[in-house]
Design a protein with these regions (language model features):
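H-loop (His-switch) and adjacent beta-strand-loop-beta switch element
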Residues: 160-173
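ABC family nucleotide-binding domain
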Residues: 1-156, 160-163
Length: 176
């Protein structure tokens, strides 16, 4: 619902002063592409596109110019600079997830939604990816919401909201 993939039965979601409920399906698709970055458990990279092409795809679909300086800063931060001409199948899972993060950040979205971004990664790589998400949040002034079942991942967050059976049962604030 928060990502605009589905609509709510009651209540609402507002992002950048826009009610998602007021948008039709096509408008929500465009709004999502411009305002919400997604990082999924499955990296959702297109195998036939290079790493560079995968990262810039949302901008190309939207007909937007690429901010080259911002692109370079993102790929440098995520350690992808020397991998841009490679293809997804030649990268490790952690590297593919970094590409997914870069793609999510490039459009400068209002929020990045990361759904189990470490689910397919080993514990060391998981902590590395979460650390990168956290440093990107600070460096790029980005709101990142992570959904996880891993307690170690949750403990790295500034705020933790725990849910069970669709209801919030605790709220923790680690650094606020």
């Amino acid at each position: 619902i928060l990502g605009g993939l589905d609509t709510s039965d009651f209540g609402g979601v507002w992002i950048r002063n826009t009610s998602l409920k007021d948008l039709n399906k096509e408008e929500r698709t465009i709004f999502r592409r411009r305002n919400i970055g997604f990082v999924f458990q499955q990296y959702n990279l297109i195998p036939s596109l290079s790493i560079r092409e995968n990262i810039v795809l949302p901008m190309r679909l939207d007909g937007k110019e690429i901010d080259v300086d911002f692109f370079n800063e993102i790929v440098e931060t995520l350690g992808l600079k020397d991998k841009l001409e490679r293809f997804p199948s030649t990268l490790s899972g952690g590297q593919q997830q970094r590409v997914s993060i870069a793609r999510a950040l490039l459009t400068k979205p209002a929020i990045v939604l990361a759904d189990e971004p470490t689910g397919n990664l080993d514990s060391v790589t998981s902590m590395e990816v979460v650390g990168l998400l956290k440093s990107c949040a600070v460096r790029f002034h980005q709101t990142i919401l992570i959904v996880t079942h891993q307690e170690e991942v949750a403990q790295m967050a500034d705020r933790v909201i725990r849910m069970s059976d669709g209801k919030i049962y605790t709220r923790d604030c680690n650094d606020c």
